Amino acid sequence: MEVKAETMRESEPNNTIETSNIITRNDETAYGAANGTYDGQSVVYGYSSKDDIDFYKVYLYQGINYMTCNDHDFEYEITGKDGTLIQKGIYKDLNIFGPTAYKVDIPRTDYYYIKINGCSSKSESYLFLIGSPTYSVNNYSVKCTEGTVSMTQSNGNKIVHFDLTSVEDIPKDAIVYSVSMFGIRTTAVKSIKLKNEKDKKEILLEKYVWNKKALIAMEMPAVSTWSAILEYNKNISFIPTLRVDYAYPVYNTMIQ
């Protein structure tokens, strides 16, 4: 699979507005994170210190954007073409999992300047993206609320439920790109139909492997109650487990 993320490396000299490096706005989507291509991702990579200021020029859209930072500590400052200060801040590497994002309200669609200044006396690396939020992926597994399910040959259909509505680790904006069912006897199953109770969308899991991939376009919310219609053809008891794989925008920090 081709990775389509773009990495732009700092090019010296860029210590004045006039010598600013022109960079590309980050334009990531959940789809790119889910399929591993990271299409639209634009990462800026450079080195800075207290005595080494770096300038970048970027075209941003009006509205909420995100300054996503990683690596070593640095100060950032975002200004308009006329020198108007839009936002400034300090990124601190607190050894948290992944990058930290800061919301930036851009007043109008136009070019803007970003000033980066390292916090150390020695030159240290930094990373940032600006524009859309970056996306990450994660997963969560949950057993059915009914506990042990008993099936018979004469009554082979049952509905079970999986509750992810109160799972704090799943971001509210997470959308599903893959689902899997575990804890079942593959040879005893006829079919499994899964339903997202929040948006009422249904999917039929692939037979024998009991999963379904490439679901990102359906935009199903991960935070939901899920129901499954299980069709069995044997006398058997089991505890089904649902695994939900999801992508989510990083509005602050990633969830480990």
Named regions from a protein language model:
Residues V3-D54, Q62-N65, Y91, P133-I159:
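Non-catalytic extracellular/lumenal accessory regions of secreted precursors
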Residues Y113-K115, N196-Q256:
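Cysteine-clustered segments with highest specificity for TGF-beta superfamily mature ligands
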Residues G98-D105, F162-S166, W210-M218:
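Exposed aromatic-hydrophobic patches
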Residues T84-N95, C144-V149, V189-K193, E197-K213:
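Solvent-exposed serine/threonine-rich low-complexity stretches and specific carbohydrate-binding patches
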Residues V142, E146-R185:
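Short, surface-exposed binding/anchoring microloops in extracellular/periplasmic proteins
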Residues G46-Y111, K115-S123, P171-I175, S180-K195:
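Acidic, Ser/Thr/Pro-rich low-complexity intrinsically disordered segments
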